[in-house]
């Protein structure tokens, strides 16, 4: 059996890929919201009740959660001796820490990185994998809507691909949001938009899509930008680009939370499909 922690929008869709080809996929309902329970039911996941029960019954655990929770998730199953797949947006350095937690107690580790939207149709989403057992995980998804690919020979190659990809997609989204806000504060936004229409005709539309995506999910991207910054620093590259991107996304409130930081750019609107990965 396969354990899935947890069935958020991405996790539930990944779980559905597994159940659609006959795998039993366990999840833990304890402490989870009604929305999560509904997603798990729609994906035909089997409720084991607690994370401990998932770890006791599953031979493989797939972790799909926000990057700030990746290490905590590994601690939650500390002592698990099966195959642990971390498919979160974390730096190679964090991935090595998670791998150490798992392998220190006899488990095996596969690194993963998901690029694209939740896999509900073929060709939309890739799961990059690396590590000695990567091909075993790849085989689980054969024939499903999730395209799995081996990223490289190093243990954390998959995380490196995810960091490099997100550095562009979400990093440039943060940059264009900052540019729009700068122009607005200086009173030249309409002039800038007119110039974009002449020389960069796709930028206004992109900035609107980036703002809408950030309004919905920007708070989740703060930790990812910090992980990318750490990846850059570890490679002796400037990390300031993505530290700044983290600060931009930090200004977007968790939806429904009134006491969150002000989002100066959220007036631009919403497009949950931009950016992806």
Where are the language model's segments positioned?
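Rossmann-fold NAD(P) dinucleotide-binding segment
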Residues: 53-108
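Rossmann-fold dinucleotide-binding core
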Residues: 4, 70, 90-170
């Amino acid at each position: 059996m396969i354990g899935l922690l947890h069935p958020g929008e991405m996790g539930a869709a990944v779980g559905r890929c597994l159940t659609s080809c006959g795998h039993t996929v366990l999840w833990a309902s304890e402490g989870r919201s009604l929305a999560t329970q509904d997603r798990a039911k729609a994906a035909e996941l089997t409720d084991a009740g607690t994370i401990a029960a998932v770890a006791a019954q599953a031979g493989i655990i797939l972790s799909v959660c926000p990057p700030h929770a990746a290490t905590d998730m590994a601690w939650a199953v500390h002592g698990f001796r099966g195959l642990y797949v971390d498919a979160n947006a974390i730096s190679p350095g964090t991935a090595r820490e998670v791998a150490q937690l798992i392998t220190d107690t006899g488990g095996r580790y596969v690194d993963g990185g998901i690029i694209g939207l939740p896999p509900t149709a073929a060709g939309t989403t890739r799961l990059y994998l690396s590590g000695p057992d990567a091909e075993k995980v790849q085989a689980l998804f054969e024939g499903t809507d999730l395209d799995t690919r081996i990223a490289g020979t190093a243990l954390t190659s998959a995380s490196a691909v995810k960091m490099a990809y997100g550095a562009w997609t979400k990093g440039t989204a943060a940059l264009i949001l900052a540019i729009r806000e700068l122009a607005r504060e200086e009173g030249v936004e309409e002039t800038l938009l007119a110039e974009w229409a002449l020389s960069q005709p796709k930028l206004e539309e992109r900035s609107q899509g980036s703002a809408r995506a950030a309004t919905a999910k920007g708070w989740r991207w703060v930790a990812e930008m910090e992980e990318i910054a750490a990846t850059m620093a570890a490679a002796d590259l400037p990390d300031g680009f993505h530290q700044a991107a983290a600060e931009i996304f930090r200004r977007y409130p968790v939806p429904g939370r009134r006491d969150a930081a002000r989002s100066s750019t959220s007036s631009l609107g919403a497009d949950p499909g931009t950016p992806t990965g």
